[in-house]
């Protein structure tokens, strides 16, 4: 593992219990280990109706369940609300990644996370989405804060999970655990656009369920 010293985390003032929205095991691995190392009380909330097809959704979810069980962390498996997701992003099918479709997607996922947190005694929500260098952290934080603002007792923790070596440790943990390595964000439109880009470069299309972190290095 990296020799970088993981910083001790402190929750926003007066906060005690976190509901972590997890998008996948690779992104949440470092977030989980960092919170565990800092003695933070948290649970994982998996609500990602944006992941398609179902085969890909199940692979990503099961990787996250496996890692949560290894660490003894509660894993809350929310509904696979795919039909409502498609309705939410209707008319945005051809918007670029990081655009308004992604904002609508984040809003939907964080709104459900915030509702669950409010109803089950969590005073803080955050997400593993921001650790990925492919994501716009300001976009994610804006969606998270907007969702949390619906409830007087809730805040969105805008901690930058990339800093202090977080991004590097994310990759190291993924290789250590041989996590499934997804090759697109999640939705059918992301899969479509990624495959279009690959074809333009003369590369093979994405094959689901075959690529894992660290496996090639061991061969």
Curated annotation (Swiss-Prot):
Its EC number is 1.17.99.6. Disulfide bonds join 185-187. One of its GO terms (molecular function) is 4 iron, 4 sulfur cluster binding. Keywords: 4Fe-4S, Disulfide bond, Iron, Iron-sulfur, Metal-binding, Oxidoreductase, Queuosine biosynthesis, Redox-active center, tRNA processing. One of its GO terms (biological process) is tRNA modification. It catalyses: epoxyqueuosine(34) in tRNA + AH2 = queuosine(34) in tRNA + A + H2O. It holds the Pfam family QueH. Pathway: tRNA modification; tRNA-queuosine biosynthesis. This is Epoxyqueuosine reductase QueH. It comes from Bordetella pertussis (strain Tohama I / ATCC BAA-589 / NCTC 13251). The lineage of its organism: Bacteria, Pseudomonadati, Pseudomonadota, Betaproteobacteria, Burkholderiales.
């Amino acid at each position: 593992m990296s020799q970088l010293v993981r910083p001790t985390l402190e929750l926003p003032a007066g906060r005690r219990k976190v509901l972590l929205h997890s998008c996948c095991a690779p992104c949440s691995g470092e977030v989980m280990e960092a919170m565990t190392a800092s003695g933070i009380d948290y649970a994982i909330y998996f609500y990602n109706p944006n992941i398609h097809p179902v085969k890909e959704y199940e692979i990503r979810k099961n990787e996250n369940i496996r890692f949560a069980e290894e660490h003894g962390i509660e894993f809350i498996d929310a509904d696979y609300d795919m039909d409502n997701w498609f309705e939410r992003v209707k008319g945005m099918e051809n918007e670029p990644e990081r655009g308004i479709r992604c904002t609508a997607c984040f809003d939907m996922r964080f709104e459900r996370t915030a509702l669950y947190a409010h109803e089950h005694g969590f005073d803080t929500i955050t997400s593993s989405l921001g650790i990925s260098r492919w994501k716009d952290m300001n976009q994610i934080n804006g969606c998270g804060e907007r969702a949390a603002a619906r409830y007087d007792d809730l805040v969105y923790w805008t901690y930058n999970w990339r800093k202090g070596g977080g991004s590097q440790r994310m990759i190291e943990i993924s290789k250590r655990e041989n996590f499934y390595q997804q090759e697109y964000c999640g939705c059918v439109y992301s899969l479509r656009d990624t495959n279009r880009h690959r074809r333009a470069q003369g590369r093979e299309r994405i094959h689901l369920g075959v690529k894992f972190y660290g496996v090639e290095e061991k061969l």
